[in-house]
């Protein structure tokens, strides 16, 4: 093998290329690689944090939904209880009002009955006085007495 000038020139140019690459190109390549590695690591870390936050948010949302369901159940139970109380109160008020109306009607009926009885008493006493007056004016006759009493009884 002959070592000639071309081979030496190629070795020198290769050495210059290596020196130039390590001095000027290689630091930029390493910097770009390190930057890319850092960006990828940050992205993976952010993805992991996002996954953890999603899990936590899912858990919190489940807790919130459960709390809301419990509150809704409680509110519905209270509303049903209040509704039944209102119904019972309305029934009691209606019964009291009905009893009051019935008592008023009975009192009014009793007053009307008493007025009617009083009116009948006055009419009976007036008829009795009129009958006694007629009997006293006429002669005492049994047949006439009986006829007058029958007439008075028919008028009653």
Curated annotation (Swiss-Prot):
The chain crosses the membrane at residues 7-29. It is found in: Cell inner membrane. Keywords: ATP synthesis, Cell inner membrane, Cell membrane, CF(0), Hydrogen ion transport, Ion transport, Membrane, Transmembrane, Transmembrane helix, Transport. It holds the Pfam family ATP-synt_B. GO terms for molecular function: proton-transporting ATP synthase activity, rotational mechanism; proton-transporting ATPase activity, rotational mechanism. InterPro entries: ATP_synth_B-like_membr_sf (IPR028987), ATP_synth_b/b'su_bac/chlpt (IPR002146), ATP_synth_F0_bsu_bac (IPR005864), ATP_synthase_B_chain (IPR050059). The keyword Ion transport applies. SUPFAM superfamilies: F1F0 ATP synthase subunit B, membrane domain (SSF81573). GO terms for cellular component: plasma membrane; proton-transporting ATP synthase complex. It is a single-pass membrane protein. F(1)F(0) ATP synthase produces ATP from ADP in the presence of a proton or sodium gradient. F-type ATPases consist of two structural domains, F(1) containing the extramembraneous catalytic core and F(0) containing the membrane proton channel, linked together by a central stalk and a peripheral stalk. During catalysis, ATP synthesis in the catalytic domain of F(1) is coupled via a rotary mechanism of the central stalk subunits to proton translocation. F-type ATPases have 2 components, F(1) - the catalytic core - and F(0) - the membrane proton channel. F(1) has five subunits: alpha(3), beta(3), gamma(1), delta(1), epsilon(1). F(0) has three main subunits: a(1), b(2) and c(10-14). The alpha and beta chains form an alternating ring which encloses part of the gamma chain. F(1) is attached to F(0) by a central stalk formed by the gamma and epsilon chains, while a peripheral stalk is formed by the delta and b chains. Belongs to the ATPase B chain family. This is ATP synthase subunit b. The lineage of its organism: Bacteria, Pseudomonadati, Pseudomonadota, Betaproteobacteria, Nitrosomonadales.
């Amino acid at each position: 093998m002959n070592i000639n000038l071309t081979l030496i020139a190629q070795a020198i140019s290769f050495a210059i290329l290596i020196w130039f690459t390590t001095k000027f190109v290689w630091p930029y390549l390493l910097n770009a690689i390190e930057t890319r590695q850092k960006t990828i690591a940050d992205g993976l870390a952010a993805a992991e944090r996002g996954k953890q936050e999603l899990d936590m948010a899912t858990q919190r949302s489940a807790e919130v939904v459960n709390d809301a369901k419990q509150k809704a159940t409680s509110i519905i139970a209270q509303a049903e209880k209040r509704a039944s109380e209102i119904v019972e109160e309305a029934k009691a008020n209606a019964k009291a009002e009905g009893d009051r109306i019935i008592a008023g009607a009975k009192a009014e009926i009793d007053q009307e009955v008493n007025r009617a009885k009083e009116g009948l008493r006055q009419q009976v006493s007036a008829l009795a006085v009129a009958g006694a007056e007629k009997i006293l004016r006429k002669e005492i006759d049994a047949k006439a007495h009986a006829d007058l009493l029958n007439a008075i009884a028919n008028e009653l």
